[in-house]
């Protein structure tokens, strides 16, 4: 596989909502779209399971994930980096 193919994969930024599984995190990604008739911005969200090899991401962190080959029945992404750590109050 060439380096160009690896870099053309989707990179998504989202927030970790679950880190309860071993080496797996659940990331929620929110997007906004305008309603076709009324023009109001509507928020859509989707959850992705991502592979976290070192278990470094925690709940509430902002992370970047990249598309990869299927790692399990539901995992299609892997963790690239933790952009921002969660603030614990």
Swiss-Prot record:
GO molecular function terms attached to this record: rRNA binding; structural constituent of ribosome
Disulfide bridge map: none
Annotated signal sequence range: none
Gene Ontology CC: cytosolic small ribosomal subunit
Single GO biological process annotation from the record: translation
Pfam family of the protein (one): Ribosomal_S17
InterPro entries, per database record: NA-bd_OB-fold, Ribosomal_uS17, Ribosomal_uS17_bact/chlr, Ribosomal_uS17_CS
Chain ranges passing through the membrane: none
UniProt keyword list: Ribonucleoprotein, Ribosomal protein, RNA-binding, rRNA-binding
Top-level division of the source organism's lineage: Bacteria
Subunit structure: Part of the 30S ribosomal subunit.
Family under the similarity heading: Belongs to the universal ribosomal protein uS17 family.
UniProt function note: One of the primary rRNA binding proteins, it binds specifically to the 5'-end of 16S ribosomal RNA.
Protein name according to UniProt: Small ribosomal subunit protein uS17
Lineage of source species: Bacteria, Bacillati, Bacillota, Bacilli, Lactobacillales
């Amino acid at each position: 596989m060439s380096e160009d193919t690896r870099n053309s994969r989707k990179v998504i930024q989202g927030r970790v909502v679950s880190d309860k599984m071993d080496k797996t995190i659940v990331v929620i990604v929110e997007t906004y779209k305008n309603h076709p008739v009324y023009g109001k911005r509507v928020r859509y969200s989707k959850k992705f399971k991502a592979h976290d090899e070192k278990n470094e991401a925690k709940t509430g962190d902002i992370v970047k994930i990249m598309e990869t080959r299927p790692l399990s029945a539901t995992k299609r992404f892997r963790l690239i980096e933790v952009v921002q750590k969660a603030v614990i109050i």
